[in-house]
Amino acid sequence: TPEAEALVIGVAPAGGNLPETWIEDIEDAIRAGCDVVSGLHVFLGEEDHWQSLAEQHGARLFDVRKSPTDDQLRVGDGSVDDVDADVVLTLGTDCAVGKRTTTFELYQAAQADGLDAGWVATGQTGIMVGAHEGVVVDRVPADFIAGVVEDLVSTVAADHDLVFVEGQASLTHRAYSGVTLSILHGAWPDAVVLADEPVREGRTHFERFQVDGVEKELRLIEDLSN
């Protein structure tokens, strides 16, 4: 059995803190020489304990959820309209309905059919699994989300004929709709694929909010991208 070379932390617990029950496992991995790829809100590479331990054992720390640098931040200007590639955005009726998985599956299927496809991630897990470009949008100041997404789409479109973009949350979600709208306006897609869980009534982690359904979501998508 080959030895592991990296530990990937693909879970971001509510509140963003590092659970105490995980610390020993992460320490053991570093002592074994494993790099750590983390999607946590807490940046291991900026904490003395983890930096010191990694240096002692020749391991590297990768904090995927870091904010873009200042030179990557700009307001959207519509330049994505000039790309030659077809852009497909995956949206949903709620959080955690399969937008990222659908985006990745569409990308793989397009490649299998011989299409020149690339994809853009908007969350840490998509970046970890190999998107051509990506950003963790919840780390981007609100004014700049559309511009950052626009740049990522344009970059991938320069090298590919078809670009798939991972969406976040939903336009009808009272907590996160602003992020969804910024991604929609930044990607300005030629087509949208809508993910839905038909039996879901209450929103994930927001049970007082109800899922509004496919028809309302589609109307908003069409109205806001016309």
Name every feature range the model reports, one short phrase each.
Residues T1-D86, L91-G92:
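N-terminal Rossmann-like NAD(P) cofactor-binding subdomain of oxidoreductases
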Residues P2-E5, A32, Q56-A59, V83-D86, ...:
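Short coil/turn connectors at secondary-structure junctions
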Residues G10-A12, G39-H41, V64-K66, L91-D94, ...:
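Fold-independent oxyanion-binding glycine-rich loops
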Residues N17-P19, A96-F104, M128-V129, L171-Y176:
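Short glycine/serine/threonine-rich phosphate/pyrophosphate-binding segments
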Residues W22-I26, Y107, T180-L181, L218:
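Generic hydrophobic/aromatic pocket-lining and core-packing "Φ" positions
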Residues V42-L44, D48-S52, D63-D71, G76-G78, ...:
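Conserved catalytic-core segment of NTP-binding enzymes
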Residues R74-W119:
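Walker A (P-loop) phosphate-binding motif
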Residues Y107-D143:
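N-terminal phosphate/diphosphate-binding loop that engages ATP/GTP or pyrophosphate donors
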